[in-house]
Each structure stands twice: as C-alpha cells, then as structure tokens.
C-alpha cells in the first residue's frame, strides 16, 4: 500500500516547486514538534496538575517528551497514510529513506527537490505564487487558532485549549502540507475525491503500520504503543464522517486527527481537537484512555477506554455546566470586580476559574457556598434595615470580594452611609445630634450585621439612584456616598440660609422704621398713627426680628412722640422757645441712644445704608434746628415751608443713595409741597399724614422693582416742584441762618459721629 501512495505522491508532485513546498512544510512540522516539546510541559503543568497527581503528570510529561522525538518519524508515516496526499507522502518518503528502503526510488526523485526547496526558501519569499499558497495555508491556520483561543477564554476550554493550541502547530503544519497539495489537486477535482476515498482505506491500512510501529515502540516505551493502538480507531471514526465534508476540509480534519496522535503524548486532552472537528466523545474517550494511562500496556487499552469514560464523563459536565452557568457570568463580573472593588481578590477568583477544570470545580463549590451566604446575608439585611435588594446578582458579585479585606472598609463606609440615611431625620437637630446619631447607630448593629448592611447600602443606593443594570453596581457606591454627603451639606446650608434671609428682611425693616421716624418728625400727626403701625409690625416681627431691633424700634417711638410735642407747641404760638430747646436737647440724646443701637446691626448688612442713615440723621437734626429757629422768628406757615424746602433738597440728595427712603420721603414732599401753598395748613396736614401713612405702608410691602418704578415717576414730578421752591427756601434760610447754624453746629458733632 505504501508503494501506491508513493506513486500517487509522485504523480501529484511532478512539479518541483510544489514538491519543494511539501518538503518545507514537512520540515516546519518537525520544528513545530520541537516547539510543542517546549510549550507542552508548561501548559500541562498548569492544566494537568490539578486533575492528576503532580507526580503522575510529571512522569507522563517526561515519557511524552522522550517518546515524542521517537514518534515523530512514526507519526509522519501515519499522517501520510491517513491524509493520503502528496505533501504528507513527500514527508513520508523523505523520512522513509532513512527508515525504510522500500521507497528509495521515490525518495531519489524527491530528495533533490527537497534540497532545492531548502535553497529556494529566500527565493520563494520573493515569489508571489508561492506566497499565495502559503497565504492560503497560513490564513487557514489563523482561522483555526482564533476559534480555539476563544474557547481558551472560557476556563473549561482553557484546559483543553493548550492541547488544541499545540496540536494546531503540528496539524496546522500538516494542513499546510496537505493544503498546498489540495491546491494542486484543485487543478483536477477528481484526485481530491480519490483522496477522500483513499483516505478511508488508508486509515484502515494504517492499522498494520501503526501496530508495527507500536510493537517497535513497546520495546522502547509502553506509552507509545497505547498511542498507536487507539489512534487507528480515531482515524477510522474521523474518516467516516469526513466524506460528507469538502475534500479540502477532509485533508485538514484528517491532519488534525493525526495531530491528535502527536499531541496525546504531551497532553492528556487532545480530545477537544477531535471534538471541535465535530466527532463524537467516543474518540475523545479513546484518546483520553491512551493519554491518561500512558503507563499501562497495549492490551489494557480496551478496558482502560471503558474506565476513562468515567473521567471524561466527569469532565464534560464541567465543560457544559461551567460554560453554561458559572463561567460566563464570572468573567464579566470579574472584570467589574476588578474595577469597583479590590483587584487582588478578583484576580484570584479569575485565576481559579481559568487554569483548569479542577479549579473550576473548586470555584463552583465556592460560588455555591457563597451563594448560600448572600442568601443568609440578604435575610439579615432585610431584617436589620428593611431594605429590599433589587438584584441579588450584585450580592453574588460582591460576595467573593467581601471576604476578609473588604470587611474593615465596609465598616468605615457603614459609618458614613447609615448617618446619611438618618440625616433627613436629624436635619431639624444640631450637628452635634448628627454626630451622636452616628456614634449611636454603629454600636446598635453587630459587626456581622454591619458588614452585611454595608453591602446592602452600596447595592441599594446604587440601584435607587442609578437605574443602570447590576454590573456597574460596584463602581457607583463611592460617588453615591459623595453625593449623599453633598446632599447633607446642602441641607445644612439650607438650614443656615433661612436665617440669613431673616436678617436681610430685618435690616430693610430697620431702615424703613428709621425713615418712618424721620417722616414722623417732619409731619405733626404722623407720630401717633405710625407708632400704632409699628407696634403692629413689631408684633408680627417678634418671632423673626432679634431683640436689638425691638429696642431700636422702641427708641424710635420715643423720637416720634417728642417731635409731636415740638410741633404741637410751635403750631399754636411761636413764643415757647424755652420749651423747644429742652425738647430738642431731649431729641438729640434720644437720637444718640436710638441710632447707635441699629448701627451694630447695619454693618452686618450694608455699610452704605448705614452711612446714608447717619447723613439722614444729621440732616433731620438740621431740619429740626431750622424749624425751631424759624418758629422763633417767623410764622408757622413760613416754618413749614422752610422745612418742606429743606426736605426737598435733602430728599433729592438721598434719592441718589437710598431708594427706599426716597420713596417714602418723596411721597411726603409731593403732598406737602402741594399743600404748602394752601391757607389751611394743619387741616390739610391731617389729610397728608393719612396719605403719607398709606403710602408708607404700601412701599414697605412692595417689591424692589415696583419701588424703582415709583421712584422714577415721583422723582420726575419732584424735580419740577422742587425747583420752584428752592428759591423761596434759600431766602428763608438766609433769614434764619444764625439760629439754624447754632443748633446744627451743636448737634452735628454729637449725632453724626
């Protein structure tokens, strides 16, 4: 049979270039075997040790390495029989020259081609056609590798992946041998079909060759015989389903089956390769039997195959179960755990998942125990704090990490989170109460409950505030804490701020009261009505206004009552100067006592307003002095006109500085200036006072925007009226300069300080 195959190989590889490619690929297969020798022990050391005893795995690996070099030649011959195509036949003849002289004739034709291929490697790199064949082969290799690497990502395939990855090296090289030959067969589709047809009898024919090689190897090592014996069954099984596949795929899959013969020596799991090709688990059982029991002789292989299905049966449920249930969630979960929580614990969990199925079993047991723990935790959590966990999956994510390292951190976070939940209740209380509540809330719950409740807070807070899915839960808790603190600070600021607007409200009230007192001093009957209004206002403001304001308002009432006495004395007769002087003396100390009281309050609010009020006080005192001097020298009508004109000038100055006082005083000016020309002054003044009071009440309650609008309208009217009266006021002032100067000079240094 070998002669027929050699003839077929000669017929296919008549072109020297193609034969050279086959030789190169065959040589590369040997190099890949060397790579497998180096790589296999490391992979097997990681994957096989947890399943098998460390000593057994080491012994098997040593035997595999020793046997592999010996099996390289036999495997190449077996591959040529299994693939039954030119590239493998060339490799077979190349080594057949060394081992068997039967194919010397074919070898003579091929050896010079092999030499040429070795020499022409640099030339082939430059040639495009040859690269096209290689690109096809390498492209298929790349396609095969990523699929298995993806399987390697899952922990179950991680154990099998090393075998597949290494097997790919050799089978890929074999595929490279077979695929260029397929390209040559592509010239005529019939030889490809014949290859498929022959591959089946070739697999049957391999049995004597493999058995012969096995008998030779039994002398050297028993493990090799085991490989050779089960291998033909795998080849037969592989050959049966393959005819349905395409001819090109037949070569690749058969090369993979032969590769399983190579790999089983190194790794106990070449099975997935055959399984990935779509073959049943029976092949895997035979391969696993030969690999798992490398020490047993060939005769025991059949019963061993019966025993090994139990091992394989133990493994596949892990593959199905872990891939189906446990492994896919932990991988995304593990990545999230690395981000949101401690990376060390998560990396350990990931390592336990990936290296081997035995570790996966441990992980599954841990996950089960952990899953039972979060259930108990959830019960304790709901009992302790009444929170409802929206996603129990988040607890599973947190559990593996929540072992020892996170517990202290959780205790710290709990101290923060629990008071935050309690803050809305404590907002009415002082900050000291909050600290007490913090200290009290921690000892109430036991340490175990605190740890559990911490996880609850993190999960619950994240779920309530961020409606995102459970995976990002570990990320959000720290920002949720920060936001909670910010909210608590905002609440505290809100508690503080309502006091500030009260102070602001109080200060304009004080200014309004001062303005009311000034107007009351100027007008005769404003004092009594204004006092009644202020009493009503004070009663309304007792809650919000501090006591100092009440004192200032009371002193203002005294001021307002005294000017009423002044006006009452001056109105009937201009004679009582002696009465006015002590009254004025009383006014000044009253003003001294009254105005300094609001001064400490004013600087807290607005210094400008304080300065304006002081200037107003000085001017009011000037007005009172001028009124007294005018009463002594002129009639009451002229006194009122002078006072009104003085007010016009003063109010014009005040309008620039203070808008609220100007509104009140300008309303007084308009009414007073209009009625100053009338003969019946006091009768009109009674009406004026009532109008003034009504005007005062309105602007006090009006908003700033309305006040500004009224100021603009009133100031325009005042300017026209005041300009006409300024001249008369100047004349009256010149006549009364002496008395007015004396009184104002005495009062200014006292009051304006």
UniProtKB/Swiss-Prot annotation:
<feature type="compositionally biased region" description="Low complexity">
    <location>
        <begin position="246"/>
        <end position="262"/>
    </location>
</feature>
<dbReference type="GO" id="GO:0034237">
    <property type="term" value="F:protein kinase A regulatory subunit binding"/>
</dbReference>
<dbReference type="GO" id="GO:0007281">
    <property type="term" value="P:germ cell development"/>
</dbReference>
<dbReference type="GO" id="GO:0005737">
    <property type="term" value="C:cytoplasm"/>
</dbReference>
<feature type="region of interest" description="Disordered">
    <location>
        <begin position="531"/>
        <end position="604"/>
    </location>
</feature>
<dbReference type="GO" id="GO:0071361">
    <property type="term" value="P:cellular response to ethanol"/>
</dbReference>
<feature type="region of interest" description="Disordered">
    <location>
        <begin position="658"/>
        <end position="684"/>
    </location>
</feature>
<dbReference type="GO" id="GO:0032956">
    <property type="term" value="P:regulation of actin cytoskeleton organization"/>
</dbReference>
<feature type="compositionally biased region" description="Low complexity">
    <location>
        <begin position="545"/>
        <end position="561"/>
    </location>
</feature>
<keyword id="KW-1003">Cell membrane</keyword>
<keyword id="KW-0206">Cytoskeleton</keyword>
<comment type="subunit">
    <text>Homodimer. Interacts with Cam; interaction is calcium-dependent and is inhibited by PKC-mediated phosphorylation of Akap200. Interacts with N/Notch; the interaction stabilizes N/Notch protein levels by preventing Cbl-mediated ubiquitination and subsequent lysosomal degradation of N/Notch. Interacts with Pka-R2. Binds to F-actin; interaction is independent of myristoylation, but is inhibited by Akap200 phosphorylation and Cam binding. Isoform B: Does not bind to Pka-R2.</text>
</comment>
<feature type="compositionally biased region" description="Basic and acidic residues">
    <location>
        <begin position="8"/>
        <end position="38"/>
    </location>
</feature>
<dbReference type="GO" id="GO:0005856">
    <property type="term" value="C:cytoskeleton"/>
</dbReference>
<keyword id="KW-0449">Lipoprotein</keyword>
<dbReference type="GO" id="GO:0045747">
    <property type="term" value="P:positive regulation of Notch signaling pathway"/>
</dbReference>
<feature type="compositionally biased region" description="Pro residues">
    <location>
        <begin position="468"/>
        <end position="480"/>
    </location>
</feature>
<keyword id="KW-0519">Myristate</keyword>
<feature type="modified residue" description="Phosphoserine">
    <location>
        <position position="135"/>
    </location>
</feature>
<comment type="function">
    <text>Scaffolding protein involved in the regulation of PKA signaling and anchoring to the actin cytoskeleton integrating signals propagated by cAMP, diacylglycerol and calcium. Contributes to the maintenance and regulation of cytoskeletal structures in germline via PKA-mediated signaling. As part of ethanol response in the glia, mediates ethanol-induced structural remodeling of actin cytoskeleton and perineurial membrane topology by anchoring PKA to the membrane of perineurial glia.</text>
</comment>
<feature type="compositionally biased region" description="Basic residues">
    <location>
        <begin position="120"/>
        <end position="132"/>
    </location>
</feature>
<feature type="compositionally biased region" description="Basic and acidic residues">
    <location>
        <begin position="216"/>
        <end position="227"/>
    </location>
</feature>
<dbReference type="GO" id="GO:0048149">
    <property type="term" value="P:behavioral response to ethanol"/>
</dbReference>
<feature type="compositionally biased region" description="Low complexity">
    <location>
        <begin position="152"/>
        <end position="181"/>
    </location>
</feature>
<feature type="region of interest" description="Disordered">
    <location>
        <begin position="462"/>
        <end position="482"/>
    </location>
</feature>
<keyword id="KW-0472">Membrane</keyword>
<protein>
    <recommendedName>
        <fullName>A-kinase anchor protein 200</fullName>
    </recommendedName>
</protein>
<feature type="modified residue" description="Phosphoserine">
    <location>
        <position position="137"/>
    </location>
</feature>
<feature type="compositionally biased region" description="Basic and acidic residues">
    <location>
        <begin position="578"/>
        <end position="594"/>
    </location>
</feature>
<dbReference type="GO" id="GO:0005112">
    <property type="term" value="F:Notch binding"/>
</dbReference>
<feature type="region of interest" description="Disordered">
    <location>
        <begin position="620"/>
        <end position="641"/>
    </location>
</feature>
<keyword id="KW-0597">Phosphoprotein</keyword>
<dbReference type="GO" id="GO:0005829">
    <property type="term" value="C:cytosol"/>
</dbReference>
<feature type="compositionally biased region" description="Low complexity">
    <location>
        <begin position="626"/>
        <end position="638"/>
    </location>
</feature>
<feature type="region of interest" description="Interaction with PKA-R2">
    <location>
        <begin position="345"/>
        <end position="725"/>
    </location>
</feature>
<dbReference type="GO" id="GO:1905477">
    <property type="term" value="P:positive regulation of protein localization to membrane"/>
</dbReference>
<feature type="compositionally biased region" description="Basic and acidic residues">
    <location>
        <begin position="59"/>
        <end position="77"/>
    </location>
</feature>
<feature type="compositionally biased region" description="Basic and acidic residues">
    <location>
        <begin position="674"/>
        <end position="684"/>
    </location>
</feature>
<feature type="region of interest" description="Disordered">
    <location>
        <begin position="1"/>
        <end position="345"/>
    </location>
</feature>
<feature type="region of interest" description="F-actin binding">
    <location>
        <begin position="119"/>
        <end position="148"/>
    </location>
</feature>
<feature type="compositionally biased region" description="Basic and acidic residues">
    <location>
        <begin position="532"/>
        <end position="544"/>
    </location>
</feature>
<feature type="compositionally biased region" description="Basic and acidic residues">
    <location>
        <begin position="139"/>
        <end position="151"/>
    </location>
</feature>
């Amino acid at each position: 049979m070998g002669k027929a195959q050699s003839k077929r190989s000669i017929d296919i590889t008549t072109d020297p270039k193609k034969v050279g490619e086959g030789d190169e690929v065959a040589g590369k297969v040997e190099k890949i075997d060397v790579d497998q020798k180096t790589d296999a022990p490391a992979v097997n050391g990681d994957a096989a040790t947890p399943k098998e005893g460390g000593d057994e795995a080491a012994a098997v690996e040593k035997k595999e390495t020793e046997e592999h070099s010996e099996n390289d030649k036999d495997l190449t011959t077996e591959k040529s029989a299994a693939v039954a195509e030119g590239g493998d036949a060339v490799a077979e003849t190349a080594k057949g020259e060394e081992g068997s002289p039967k194919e010397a004739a074919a070898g003579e034709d091929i050896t010079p081609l092999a030499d040429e291929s070795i020499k022409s490697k640099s030339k082939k790199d430059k040639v495009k056609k040859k690269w096209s064949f290689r690109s096809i082969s390498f492209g298929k290799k790349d396609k095969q590798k990523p699929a298995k690497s993806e399987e390697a990502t899952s922990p179950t395939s991680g154990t099998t992946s090393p075998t597949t990855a290494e097997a790919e090296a050799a089978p890929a090289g074999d595929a490279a041998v077979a695929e260029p030959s397929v390209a040559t067969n592509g010239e005529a589709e019939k030889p490809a079909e014949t290859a498929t047809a022959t591959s089946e009898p070739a697999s049957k024919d391999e049995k004597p060759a493999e058995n012969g090689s096995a008998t030779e190897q039994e002398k050297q090592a028993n493990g090799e015989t085991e490989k050779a014996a089960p291998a033909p069954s795998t080849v037969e099984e592989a050959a049966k389903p393959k005819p349905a596949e395409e001819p090109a795929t037949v070569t690749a899959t058969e090369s993979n089956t032969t590769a399983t013969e190579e790999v089983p020596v190194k790794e106990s799991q070449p099975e997935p390769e055959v399984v990935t090709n779509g073959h049943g688990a029976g092949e895997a059982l035979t391969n696993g039997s030969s690999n798992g029991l490398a020490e047993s002789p060939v005769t025991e292989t059949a019963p061993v195959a019966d025993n090994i299905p139990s091992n394989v049966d133990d493994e596949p449920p892990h593959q199905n179960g872990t891939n189906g249930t446990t492994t896919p969630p932990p991988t995304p979960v593990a990545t999230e755990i690395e981000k949101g929580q401690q990376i060390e614990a998560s990396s350990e969990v990931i390592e336990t998942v990936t290296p081997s199925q035995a570790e996966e079993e441990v992980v599954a047991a841990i996950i089960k125990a952990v899953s039972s723990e979060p259930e108990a935790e959830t019960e304790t959590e709901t009992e302790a704090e009444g929170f409802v966990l929206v996603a129990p999956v988040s607890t599973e994510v947190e559990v593996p990490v929540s072992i020892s390292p996170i517990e202290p951190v959780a205790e710290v976070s709990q101290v923060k989170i629990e008071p935050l939940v309690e803050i809305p209740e404590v907002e009415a209380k002082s900050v000291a109460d909050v600290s007490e509540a913090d200290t009290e809330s921690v000892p109430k719950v036991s340490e175990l409950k605190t740890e559990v409740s911490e996880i609850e807070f993190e999960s619950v807070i994240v779920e309530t505030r961020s409606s995102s899915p459970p995976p990002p839960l570990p990320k959000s808790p720290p920002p949720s804490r920060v936001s909670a603190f910010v909210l608590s600070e905002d609440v505290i600021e809100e508690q503080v701020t309502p006091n500030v607007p009260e102070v602001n409200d109080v200060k304009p009230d004080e200014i309004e009261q001062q303005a009311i007192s000034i107007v009351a001093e100027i007008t005769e009957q404003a004092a009594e009505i204004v006092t009644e209004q202020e009493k009503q206002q004070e009663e309304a403001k007792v809650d919000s206004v501090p006591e100092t304001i009440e004192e200032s308002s009371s002193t203002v009432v005294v001021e307002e009552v005294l000017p009423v006495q002044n006006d009452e004395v001056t109105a009937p007769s201009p004679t009582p100067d002696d009465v006015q002087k002590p009254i004025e003396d009383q006014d000044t100390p009253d003003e001294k006592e009254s105005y300094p009281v609001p001064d400490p309050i004013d600087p807290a609010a607005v210094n400008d307003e304080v300065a304006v009020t002081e200037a107003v006080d000085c001017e009011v005192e000037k007005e009172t002095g001028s009124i007294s001097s005018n009463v002594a020298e002129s009639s009451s009508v002229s006194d009122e006109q002078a006072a009104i004109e003085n007010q016009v000038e003063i109010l014009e100055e005040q309008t620039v500085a203070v808008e609220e006082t100007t509104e009140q005083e300008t309303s007084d000016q308009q009414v007073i200036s209009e009625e100053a020309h009338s003969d019946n002054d006091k009768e009109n003044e009674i009406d004026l006072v009532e109008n003034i009071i009504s005007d005062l009440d309105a602007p006090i309650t009006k908003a700033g925007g309305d006040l500004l609008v009224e100021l603009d309208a009133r100031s325009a009217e005042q300017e026209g009226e005041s300009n006409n009266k300024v001249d008369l006021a100047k004349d009256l002032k010149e006549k009364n300069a002496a008395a007015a100067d004396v009184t104002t000079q005495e009062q200014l240094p006292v009051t304006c300080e």
